[in-house]
């Protein structure tokens, strides 16, 4: 296994270009399954483990792809399978994104239930509700979702989401573009990732109204085509890099980053005392002498994102006072807190709220990653901790951050990847 070894205490400053968004890449890659001819060319696709896993899934279905210099080419002309097997789906919950496209194109899809909990804190029931509303019959047996469209064709419908769901909204969009008639989605997710998926589907020939809002209207079509498309930047990676500069007292400029997609996060950095300067495609952060404590509540977009919650907790350990971080999306997403406290943080957990007492002087030590954003949080802590911090199990980090140690070194961090044996 790999670990990151960090010598803390160095201010990080410099200029970086933001990577393409992983959370946008996955649904637009899935959407290529909707069309069976031509070649898709997708620019600004990050070279990540999750992208590789998704490509393996497409290859299993019969697609061909290549990724070079962040440009992904995909041909789905030879897709001849409707089966997404457990061996691939278990690696990544986002594999559920193939359900809608396969069902819409072939009238039948058989997709393994994602690994972990099928109906727990991150349920798939909304995805199944969407397909049933569009006229599919759903059965679950032997660990697989078996979805069959009546008479081989989905039908447009009105779908109201009881709670906002990016994944279910994405699957609804992809299924609806090939359905007969009109589909309306209310209380749909409005995240930039959904906006970008809409723009990709429109480029393919779909008709979608209300893009960027929580009410979407999709006119079904039978004619889509392959396209060349530019992916958007990764707003969570960008927020993490801004936090890396802020927690170490440095300054950073991110290029090819749209501040419109980060209003809630940039507002909180400003409240913490950081100076924020933006252009239409860049963000600059200058750190204050002392960070101020700032409460945040993670909720669906346009509110503060749950995927920045862990990083904000790390940042607030260095703020002069007490802050409260509440997560209303995933109530138990606090696995990083015991590890932060091992480094000297003072954090209490009360239900879905973390109370962070700053300023705390962190001391380096070994810490264990438990998930993607927890890994980023621990790296941030290591950057400011005194001495050496070892972040173990960084395969979690590799799922969502492209060349993270190289980028941090560019800013002045002392960080290197080493192999270790886990017993």
From Swiss-Prot:
Gene Ontology MF annotations: UDP-N-acetylglucosamine 1-carboxyvinyltransferase activity
InterPro entries: Enolpyruvate_Tfrase_dom, Enolpyruvate_Tfrase_sf, MurA_subfamily, RNA3'P_cycl/enolpyr_Trfase_a/b, UDP_GlcNAc_COvinyl_MurA
EC number: 2.5.1.7
Binding site for phosphoenolpyruvate: 22-23
Localization annotation: Cytoplasm
GO cellular component, one term: cytoplasm
Family under the similarity heading: Belongs to the EPSP synthase family. MurA subfamily.
Function according to Swiss-Prot or TrEMBL: Cell wall formation. Adds enolpyruvyl to UDP-N-acetylglucosamine.
Protein name, as recorded: UDP-N-acetylglucosamine 1-carboxyvinyltransferase
């Amino acid at each position: 296994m790999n670990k990151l070894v960090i010598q803390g205490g160095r201010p990080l400053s410099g200029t970086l270009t933001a990577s393409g968004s992983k959370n946008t890449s996955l649904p637009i890659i899935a959407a290529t399954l909707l069309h069976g001819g031509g070649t898709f060319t997708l620019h600004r696709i990050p070279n990540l483990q999750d992208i590789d896993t998704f490509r393996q899934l497409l290859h299993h279905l019969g697609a061909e792809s290549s990724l070079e210099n962040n440009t992904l080419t995909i041909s789905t002309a030879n897709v001849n399978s409707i089966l997404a097997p457990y061996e691939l789906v278990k690696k990544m919950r986002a594999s559920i994104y193939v359900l809608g496209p396969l069902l819409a194109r072939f009238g039948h899809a058989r997709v393994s239930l994602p690994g972990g909990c099928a109906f727990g804190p991150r349920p798939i029931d909304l995805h199944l509700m969407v397909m049933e509303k569009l006229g599919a019959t759903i059965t679950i047996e032997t660990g697989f979702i078996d979805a069959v469209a009546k008479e081989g064709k989905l039908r447009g419908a009105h779908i109201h989401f009881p709670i906002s769901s990016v994944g279910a909204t994405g699957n609804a969009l992809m299924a609806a573009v090939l359905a007969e008639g009109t589909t309306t989605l209310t209380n749909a997710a409005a995240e930039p990732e959904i906006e970008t998926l809409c723009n990709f589907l429109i480029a393919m020939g779909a008709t979608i109204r209300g893009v960027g809002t929580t009410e979407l209207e999709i006119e079904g079509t039978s004619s889509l085509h392959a396209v060349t498309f530019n992916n958007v930047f990764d707003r969570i990676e960008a927020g993490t890099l801004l936090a890396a500069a802020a927690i170490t007292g440095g300054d950073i400029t991110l290029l090819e980053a749209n501040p419109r997609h980060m209003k809630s996060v940039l507002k909180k950095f400003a409240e913490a005392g950081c100076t924020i300067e933006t252009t239409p495609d860049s963000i600059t952060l200058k750190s204050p002498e002392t960070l101020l404590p700032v409460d945040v509540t993670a909720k669906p977009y346009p509110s503060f994102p749950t995927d920045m919650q862990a990083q904000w907790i790390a940042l607030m350990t260095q703020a002069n006072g007490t802050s409260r971080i509440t997560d209303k999306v995933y109530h138990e997403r606090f696995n990083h807190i015991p590890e932060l406290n091992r480094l000297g943080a003072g954090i209490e957990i009360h239900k879905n709220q973390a109370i962070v007492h700053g300023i705390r002087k962190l001391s380096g030590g070994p810490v264990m990653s438990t998930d993607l954003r927890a890994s980023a949080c621990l790296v941030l802590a290591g950057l400011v901790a005194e001495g050496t911090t070892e972040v173990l199990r960084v395969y979690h980090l590799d799922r969502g951050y492209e060349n993270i140690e190289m980028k941090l070194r560019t800013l002045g961090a002392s960080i290197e990847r080493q192999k270790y044996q886990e017993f």
